[in-house]
Amino acid sequence: MKRYILLIILFISCTSYNDAYQAETITMYKNIYTEFANLSESQMEDKLKLECNIIEDEMLVHVDDGLTLNYFLEYEYYKHRFQGGSPEQVESLLFPLFYFCGLDEIIEKHWNSLDYQEKNYKKISG
């Protein structure tokens, strides 16, 4: 299983970003992170590419720690909810972001419902 995931990550890191999802991802970022709107277009693009690298690194950490990709997606959901995004805003951000980063297979196969994510978020945020 670990080898399969590492192979996917290697393949993903060798592919280019999916520009079809860039505009949607930028719009969704602006909905949660108001300061994002103050960046120039090239700064936004750089920030998204950096975010893709961060997501890939976080996924590797989760895999190395023996955690599931479902748990990794829960972490990504919580991260943006803690920043003030509504459940719908976070879901609307994560899907185009993961597609932009070339991680569409991960989110399609391992995403539980929004209700599931929010229920778990409420448990930990008390």
For the regions a protein language model found, what residue spans apply to each?
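Terminal low-complexity, poorly structured segments
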Residues: 2-6, 35, 44, 69, ...
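Immediate post-signal-peptide N-terminus of mature secreted/exported proteins
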Residues: 16-53
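Classical Sec-dependent N-terminal signal peptides that target proteins to the secretory pathway
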Residues: 1-18
